[in-house]
Amino acid sequence: MPTSPTMTSVPIARSPRPSYQQINQHQPSDSALGLVSTRSFPAIVGTADMMLKSSQVTLVGYEKIGSGYCTAVVRGKVADVRLAVEEGARTAEQFGQLVSKLVIPRPMPNLQAVFPIGSHLVELAQQQRGYSRLSNRSIGLLETRGFPAMVGAADAMLKSADVQLASYEIIGDGLCTAIVRGTVANVAMAIEVGMQEAERIGELHAVMIIPRLLEDLEHTLPVATYWLDENEPLPMLLPNQVREKQRQLVALPELEKAVVPQRQAKPLPLQEKTEAPLVLEKEAEKPIVEVLGPEID
């Protein structure tokens, strides 16, 4: 079992305030507003369940003003709202918790802009809350006057049957309500044991068991955040960057520089200078004697 879960309730959404155009879009010409008030949280939940199952109306939510006063707000056509309010008031009278009832045909847009009674607020509340893992199960509510009596009753209920503590609700005037979920048989057994424990510790104020919840009632009941599966955004699919493996350079051994014999260029042979024979000056001065032979005829 979870320890010390964070408890949250789903009250009637109060912000943002809608404009007149948005209100007129959600408001049919024959719409009506119905309110039934009790002085017990289990009683108002049972009253709202009867109102939803008796006619085609939409449960906007609950308005808790303190001192134990709770009001269920429904919307729908005029005839459906009148029937739902009458059935809800009759149920609250059976519990001995009815305070007042009201039907308003065709409420003005200004009324919806100020009070949290617009049917479009149901959509806002559903968007802010995720899916509960305790949905589609029976519900049991046990209300005590005083916090210790409620905690002791909740502990006894969890130990006596296979149920889960969904949440708790405080409405003022010392009234606290423990909410358990499970099968019909387990919830009935848990509530019976919890009643005995609450009377032993303090004051038992009211109890309620609802075997089957409608969707509108399911969305308006408080539930701990531990049991909620919040819608998470899908991860963005981005291409994976493939990193190329860097090649490691292999260090080569230093090779000794081989001495390569270089051919020495031979000097080109110089051209031999032919010196002309020197002629002595004396020899040059001598006349050249030409010897002529005898002429032969």
Swiss-Prot record:
Q: Does the keyword Transit peptide apply?
A: no
User: Ranges for the BMC domain?
Assistant: 32-116, 138-222
Which top-level group of life is the source organism from? Answer: Bacteria
Localization: Carboxysome
Query: Bias category Polar residues: which stretches?
Result: 18-29
- SUPFAM superfamilies from the xrefs? CcmK-like
A cellular-component GO term for this protein: carboxysome
Its GO biological process annotations read:
carbon fixation; photosynthesis
Q: Name one Pfam family in it.
A: BMC
Which keywords does this chain's UniProt record carry?
A: Bacterial microcompartment, Carbon dioxide fixation, Carboxysome, Photosynthesis, Repeat
GO MF: structural constituent of carboxysome shell
Please list where the region (Disordered) is annotated: 1-29
**Principal place where this protein is found?**
other
> What information about domains appears in the record's comments?
Has 2 BMC domains, is thought to trimerize giving a hexamer that may interact with CcmK proteins in the carboxysome shell.
Please explain the role this protein plays, according to its UniProt record. Required for formation of the carboxysome, a polyhedral inclusion where RuBisCO (ribulose bisphosphate carboxylase, rbcL-rbcS) is sequestered. Required for recruitment of major shell protein CcmK2 to the pre-carboxysome. Suggested to be a carboxysome shell protein.
| Assembly with partners or alone | Homooligomerizes, possibly as a trimer, interacts with CcmK in the carboxysome.
Which family is this sequence assigned to? Belongs to the bacterial microcompartments protein family.
Q: What is this protein called?
A: Carboxysome assembly protein CcmO
